[in-house]
Every structure is written in structure tokens, then in C-alpha cells.
Amino acid sequence: DGFLNVKPSTSKESGKSMSTVSDAQVALNGTYRRLTSSNYYGRRMLTYGDMKGGDFGVPTLGISDDALYTFAHEKDRNNYYSFWATLYDVILQSNNILTNIANGNVITSSTAEATTLNDIKGQALMIRALAHFDLCRLYGYPYLKDNGASWGVPVVTSILDPFAKPVRNTVAEVYTQIILDLNAAIPLLPTAKRLGNMNQWAAKALLARVYLYKGDWTNAYNTAKNVIESGGYTLYSNTNWVGSWAQPNGSES
């Protein structure tokens, strides 16, 4: 009775254009799903620093993440090129949403739909900023090394030809785009706390971190202070911290 004909909620046939707010939401769902890849926040992005910093141990070499533990930086190792491929795939999916919205392909028929579409656009901008930020942290020097003059990663804000080979931007140029995207996203996003989707406070929290990595202490402080004083989030107490790892959401999310 139609059970096998249910339309997927995270993908759409490539030959069909994005024309409705529902289509844009499906595309956004797919972008969020990509964030949970084991090559991104589903595993490796969360353990990368701990593996290299000595907080984690690898009892048996030869497993998938041992290269991180031993600092075996080789371009052909899955541990390293998978970050690059996955994060640029996230950027591609974000750009697909943003390009279709900018070109007027997504039609709204009510004020409510227009508000939802702005929300989707804001989330896509924030996700693109997050992916560029993470790429630059993984493959570029810290901003404070030389005020962002070193090579970072390619800034990609449009849908590229499959065979395109964009050149690397400087770290400063990457940060400029990240900040532009986040400042554009913030007014489009709601302030209400919601689980599973980014809101205005999440964008401001990320912006505060970007300013911190950049060494822009005043903006980092003021932006973080704005998030804290919103009252929507509180740090776990010492008593609740351990138990929080068993919960999907909490006072900090």
C-alpha cells in the first residue's frame, strides 16, 4: 500500500531541480546527515586532537586511526584525505542549497514558507562556514602564526565543475569568508532552542570561536558573552558531567 514508495527525507533525484521549500529542507537534511559521517563529526573530527595529543592511546597499530596517533601524514592515507573529501562534499551540498535559493529556483507561497526558507539559508551558510573553518584548522597553519598569511584551503562558494582545481586561499582569506557567512546567517536564524538544528546562538558561538582562533580577543569576548547572557545554555555541573555523555542532548546543546 505504498510502503515501498516513501520518498527519502535526506536525498532527492539529481535530475530534478530544487523548486519548493520542501525540496530545500530535504537537501538541508542531507547536508546535516553528511556532518555525521565517520570522517567528520561522526567520529574522526571528535577524536583527531585527542589521538594526536596523547589523551587517547592506540593499543594495537594497524587499525584505521593509528596514523593519527603516530603522526603518519601521507596524502594517500584514508585518515587524512577523507577529511578533505568529506568536508568539501558538505560545502558542495551547502552551495547547492544556497545557489538554488539565490537563483530564485525555490518558490515560496506564504510568509511562513519565506521564513522557513530564510532559516534553511541561514543553516546552509553556517554549515558552509563550519566546514571551511574545520578544513583550515586541519590543513592550514594557525592564524596567529603570521596573521593569516600562510596558505589555508580553497574557499568554495559556488557549485564547481567536477574537474575544477581551485587554488588555495590564505588562512586570512578563509577566515574572512567564514566570518562573512556567519554574519549573514545570524539574522536569518531563530533564537529559539531546538534540538538537531542550528540556531542563532549556535552561529554566534561558532563566530566567537573563529574570532578566538583569529586572535580578535574583543570580538571573541563580546560574541561569547552575548551567547552566555542569552540564558538558553548552561555548563554541566561536575556532578552531571559524566552522565551527560549518555544523553543525546542537554543544557549545553
Question: Which ranges hold each PLM region?
Answer:
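Short coil/linker segments at helix-helix boundaries
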Residues: 108-115, 138-172, 176
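Short coil/turn linking the two alpha-helices of tandem helical-hairpin repeats
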Residues: 136-143, 193, 213-215
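Extended ligand-binding clefts on enzyme/binding-domain cores
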Residues: 21-22, 26, 173, 214-215, ...
